[in-house]
Curated annotation (Swiss-Prot):
<dbReference type="GO" id="GO:0015935">
    <property type="term" value="C:small ribosomal subunit"/>
</dbReference>
<keyword id="KW-0699">rRNA-binding</keyword>
<dbReference type="InterPro" id="IPR023575">
    <property type="entry name" value="Ribosomal_uS19_SF"/>
</dbReference>
<dbReference type="InterPro" id="IPR005732">
    <property type="entry name" value="Ribosomal_uS19_bac-type"/>
</dbReference>
<dbReference type="InterPro" id="IPR002222">
    <property type="entry name" value="Ribosomal_uS19"/>
</dbReference>
<dbReference type="GO" id="GO:0019843">
    <property type="term" value="F:rRNA binding"/>
</dbReference>
<dbReference type="GO" id="GO:0003735">
    <property type="term" value="F:structural constituent of ribosome"/>
</dbReference>
<keyword id="KW-0689">Ribosomal protein</keyword>
<keyword id="KW-0687">Ribonucleoprotein</keyword>
<keyword id="KW-0694">RNA-binding</keyword>
<protein>
    <recommendedName>
        <fullName>Small ribosomal subunit protein uS19</fullName>
    </recommendedName>
</protein>
<dbReference type="GO" id="GO:0000028">
    <property type="term" value="P:ribosomal small subunit assembly"/>
</dbReference>
<comment type="similarity">
    <text>Belongs to the universal ribosomal protein uS19 family.</text>
</comment>
<dbReference type="GO" id="GO:0005737">
    <property type="term" value="C:cytoplasm"/>
</dbReference>
<dbReference type="GO" id="GO:0006412">
    <property type="term" value="P:translation"/>
</dbReference>
<dbReference type="Pfam" id="PF00203">
    <property type="entry name" value="Ribosomal_S19"/>
</dbReference>
<comment type="function">
    <text>Protein S19 forms a complex with S13 that binds strongly to the 16S ribosomal RNA.</text>
</comment>
């Protein structure tokens, strides 16, 4: 279920404060955040935001196509390492 229209989009206040502080400066640094639930606003375009995946901060460069999505959508929290491969020596050929 999506968020109610009357509530509007959500973005963490500390993240908005960090974005506003860097808008005036020429050198844009990577902004660290733990807020995966924040919606990407048009003012975020052009910034690199390091989103926490539960283990480390993963840098994400924000483009126009990402506006309206959540930050957590672009950083997976689980890594799939594949299914276990059966050992050929232990399998029986038949009886």
């Amino acid at each position: 279920m999506s968020r109610s229209i009357k509530k509007g989009p959500f973005a963490d206040a500390s993240l908005l404060k960090k974005i506003e502080a860097q808008e005036g400066s020429e050198k844009k640094q990577v902004i660290k955040t733990w807020s995966r639930r924040s919606t990407i606003f048009p003012s975020f375009v052009g910034f690199t935001i390091a989103v926490y995946d539960g283990r480390k901060h993963v840098p994400v460069y924000i483009t126009e196509d990402m506006v309206g999505h959540k930050l957590g959508e672009f950083v997976p929290t689980r890594t799939f390492r594949g299914h276990k491969v059966a050992d050929k020596a232990t399998t029986t050929v038949g009886k």
